[in-house]
Amino acid sequence: MKIAIDFDDTLATYEVQRLADMLIKSEHDVHIVTSRVSNEHAQNPRWNDDLFLIAEMLSIPKEKIHFCNLTPKWKFFCDNDDFDFHIDDDAEEVDEINQHSKTKAFHFVSTFDNSGIRRIANKIENN
């Protein structure tokens, strides 16, 4: 399956990094789709160093990192309609993606006991 994961407050968290690692090891095609601006549009050319560091740590290549440059993510998923799932901490983005695109978006909420991430992992594996 082709799976997108938001970065800020999502893949930036350890629990989602563990999920991404599991998905990659299970041979899912994992991408990063972020609202952030790319380095070309950022005021600081090192703006995305944290993102690139985590992507490298997870072996997610740069060509699988998609910057939406502050436009709504649902537009990205309408233009790139081959994604099966997207995981995001922004409930509004999740609702818009589910409303306007074929991609099934899941709302990630960090929990003390990791139950939220286990619920998402189970939904992905059972589809």
Regions found by a protein language model. Name each.
Residues 1-71:
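Alpha-helical substrate-recognition element adjacent to the catalytic core
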Residues 44-127:
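C-terminal cap/substrate-recognition subdomain and adjoining C-terminal extension
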